[in-house]
Amino acid sequence: MKIYERFGTREIVEAINRVGNAKFENITDYNKKYGFTDITLIAELFEGIGVLLEQNLIDIKMADKLFGPTLNLLWVRMKSVLYAMREGLNEPFFFSHYEYLINRLNLYRESNN
């Protein structure tokens, strides 16, 4: 539950609001306007959940119930920046467990509808 508590901290909630309201053309524009601190805070949190899920230390149903649609909404907002960061850093697996979490969550939701 510590992870869920972290999700509800002022720091994360404010980062989520800023990322959710960000308007940008590309990664250069995003970095110039906002920097990468907020995206990194959010992605690190969900990256950790993705690792726990991959290692079967958290259940996908629990992840869905705790973090719900926020995971998908933020992924949609952040995906282009995260992909550009991967390319720019030449790190193809940068925050890949966050993407793993999203993919597993989508499969779970599709199979439970």
Task: Give residue spans per PLM region.
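Amphipathic alpha-helical "stem/stalk" segments
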Residues: 1-113
